[in-house]
Amino acid sequence: APTLREWAVDEHLWIRRVAMLAQVGAGPRTDPVLLADVLVPNIPYAGEQVFFSRKAIGWALRDYARTEPDWVRAFVAAHPDLSGLSRREALKHL
């Protein structure tokens, strides 16, 4: 977890993206605190229209929504600065 938190704020997009997507597929083993910790610092990058950041945020949230839809809805509601793409992807199957 400490490594992923470091990677989430790395200067390189692809390192940040690995941190954001590291728990995709983990289902109920997903750590929601860690997920938020790696996504939140990247929301400003998503606002800068960096496609791969916006897509990764949405993908990570969409995947976790299969396990914890209420958590994902609450996360999206708490972050109105999410890009449209991230928001659409997160809520796609809800």
Language model region names:
Residues A1-L94:
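Alpha-helical scaffold domains
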